[in-house]
Curated annotation (Swiss-Prot):
Native species: Neisseria meningitidis serogroup C (strain 053442)
Cofactor: Mg(2+)
Gene behind the chain: purA
EC primary class: ligase
Function: Plays an important role in the de novo pathway of purine nucleotide biosynthesis. Catalyzes the first committed step in the biosynthesis of AMP from IMP.
Co-factor binding details: Binds 1 Mg(2+) ion per subunit.
Reactions listed under catalytic activity: IMP + L-aspartate + GTP = N(6)-(1,2-dicarboxyethyl)-AMP + GDP + phosphate + 2 H(+)
UniProt binding sites for substrate: 301-307
Protein name per its UniProtKB record: Adenylosuccinate synthetase
Amino acid sequence: MAKNVVVIGAQWGDEGKGKIVDWLAEEAGGVVRFQGGHNAGHTLVVGGKKTILRLIPSGILHESLDCFIGSGVVVSPEALLGEIDELNAAGVKNVEGRLKIAPTCPLILPYHIALDQAREASRGKGKIGTTGRGIGPAYEDKVARRAIRAADLLHPEKLREKLDAVLAYYNVQLQHLHNAEPVKAEDVMAVIEKVAPRIAPMITDVSRVLNEKNKNGEKLLFEGAQGALLDIDYGTYPFVTSSNCLAGAASAGAGVGPQMLDYVLGIVKAYTTRVGSGPFPTELFDEVGAGLAERGHEFGSVTGRARRCGWFDAAALKRSIQINGISGMCITKLDVMDGVETINICVGYELPDGGKTDILPCGSDAVETCKPIYETMEGWKESTFGIKNYEELPDNAKAYLKRIEEVCGAPVAIVSTGPDREETIVLHHPFA
């Protein structure tokens, strides 16, 4: 049996997973997305050329590599085909021939988007920060057992029956709860009839293929989306996404046994960011935070939304390491910290009752009341951009990485010093 690696975001998303998955994909026989939708982008830079992927696994740029979308992913057919067309236009070869979609993937259709946006508009100041792309309602349908799934595209007559029943449910909410326009079945069917001929050939028993590949000695790479602190169960609920973002979700979301998950690589930014609403104990509102945002280009690759920036939160990461079983960390954007004179690391929190904790509490209400406890370290003036050898890093940068290891309790396996695939320091290869 080959060794397999799960890559997950260990913070609130946007940690730089795409680059690392693309880099690791050189040694993989297949790359699998196992949860999430097209609500977050994975940015890859190869030879200075930028590619943003939302649904398609980040291994697709390796032109002999098979890529898979597992049943834990909610798929927008229109977004998927748009992404395929972008890759085709960029000269990536045989995308549709190498991309396989599980028949059990729930589809995101126009009524999901309509309800998602209507709900967020109705919340007023209580917005939870949804991207409005229908992700949440699609997951609701999955759990409520009314989802239209990829396999339904193969049976249009039965699909129409399911659609009529689903729209009866959705249109009541749209019209009577949110004062919004109803969605017409004919409009949804027009979308389905347009996308089905292209998507149908990609529908494959992903679970079976992955298990066969592993049995034949091929390495598999499981690619997570969002971040562990946005997990529906363990994140800062309700300011979370609608899926399980943890490493363990790779098993159910891809259709493989947990014994096939050999190494968990947690992607960790050298500082902390968060998009949208929700508690953020180490958030900075000063020039340091603004500088991190500017140097780190902290804007969402899909949404364009500005990211909130703060000091490294080791107490939050400790929770992530615990719930994911992280084997090693990849520290990204170390170069963004260049020139920060004094660096703070959050090592715990003061609680309202006067107590202290060294790990992130569960749920947003508890996190909202936390006051960060900081350790202070000297920064470094030298540039770390593009460094590929650990020994060439400034002493203070190495001390920073070492302290992160000590406080969090997990080793640093990889350090990313720039956006390009090659701008990477390897201390321990996850596939080794």
